[in-house]
Amino acid sequence: MLMKLHRVTYVVFLFFLGVYVLGNHLLPVSDPVESNYALTAKEMVLSGDWLSPQIYGHYWFDKPIMIYWLLSLSYSVFGMTDFASRFPSGLFGALSVAMVYQGVRTLTGQRVGSLLSAFILGTSLIVWTIAHGIITDMVLLFATVGTFYYAYRGLLVKNPWHMAVAYGFAGIAVLTKGPVGLVLPGLLFLIYAGVKRSWSMVKALFPWQGILVFLAVVLPWYGYMYHTHGMEFINGFLGLHNVTRATQSEHPEVNHWWYYLPIFLGGSLPWTGAILYGMYRGWKTRTDGYLYTMIMGWGTILFYTMMATKYPTYAFISVIPFSLLGAYGVISLKDASHRAWWWLLGPTLVLWWALGVGTFFAPWGFWWILRAVVVVLTLFLGGCYWYRKRLMMPFTVGMGTLVVLGIVLMEGLVPFLGLRSSVTYHEQVRSFHGPVYYYGEYAASVPYYLDVTPVRVEPSPERLAKYNVQRSAKWNGKNVMPQIEEQELFRRLQSGERMLIITNKNYGKELEESSVGQYLERDESSSKVVLLHSK
């Protein structure tokens, strides 16, 4: 029932683990997303309560428990460091790539196709990026790889115990992301069965063994949370963070039907062309495997397109079937015309040169190394094309991209995430003796790093409307940090309270020009943040 691991699987895992954790100790925890996970896990470790997530001392039902367990375990092993914060995503990224190799190898028996599938997944821009992040999506990717593989294998060999393992992985997904971890794969498999017009396949999707395994995985934690927190958990987790997210956009300004298409095209680089070519070539025969991957990939994108809230990583798991299609595309190129290889080379050069040219607009970093590497890689790849070294071309594309992205991490991501974090003004906050306020925006990285919990100030409706901040009032339920209204801040300023205000450039200018501007003095300003203190 379980896979016997091939020796190459271990090599794939270790290689990509090294790729994904390299340099993580240099990347600070960024705001506004990563810091919420890091702070919640920190409070879990410090409080000793490993079952009910908390943030700012309040119970927090934003996500299920899995990511907090993993981060807390990482902190327990490595300490509360930036490396520890990013280690779970790197670990599960490597596990996902290795499982794709193992799964494709077991299903097809083809070493080249298996290596290509894993290589394409592991070197895709969006996978590399998220494998360095502090979010839930890489753990979800791992769980989804297991669900997709074991469910498909269970349908092929008609073994309910394979399906039971798939349900176990779906349970991990539900502990990671919520009900969507079961609902989405279930819908996609029902669509696949419908396309195959197989009622027996529909019945095979619901074995009693699988349902028992799923309940055994998810019920202990979900049952505990309902028993302990009752309707507060139901309303917060299922209501606000699931139903509201699906029906009312958290970011209305990006709620477009085409939102995930550019993410697919850009996130799949450098393999976008190979994936599209695989789709094109596969359409002629439309084998079972082709139909399966197309339904899993495009079905995922369509599902999240229909949701009200759009977010760059929501359709992330579509990279699993698309990587298999990309491998099919690369293999098909060896029998195609020589010019067809531009399906692979074109998007690769777009990525490399976009990053190379982009360095001329970056205000930081020593970029001559990257520019030289891009030129050398381009010449080498051109030589492979000229001399028809068809095996070397995909290898050069993947390895070259990892080299380019490694330089971007060191020279670009480190300072960029610094600007997205509070680390650039830690010294001012640490040395200030008095209450600290965030006006409008909020950075959970301050309490994470400094054990100082600022008070959030909600701008007036007029100021929010001026900067086109429009979303349902229900989303205010996410703000569980200490907070006050704008008028209360003004009252405290006018009463002479000593305070430090952190805000963005727009709101900083608004405050300086408001009725309380005479009480404020600018302390420091950067491209992102303005610090104001009372006179």
Predicted regions and their residues:
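Membrane-embedded architecture of ER/inner-membrane glycosylation machinery
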Residues: A164, G278-K535
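Membrane-integral, polyisoprenol-dependent glycosyltransferases
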Residues: M1-A340
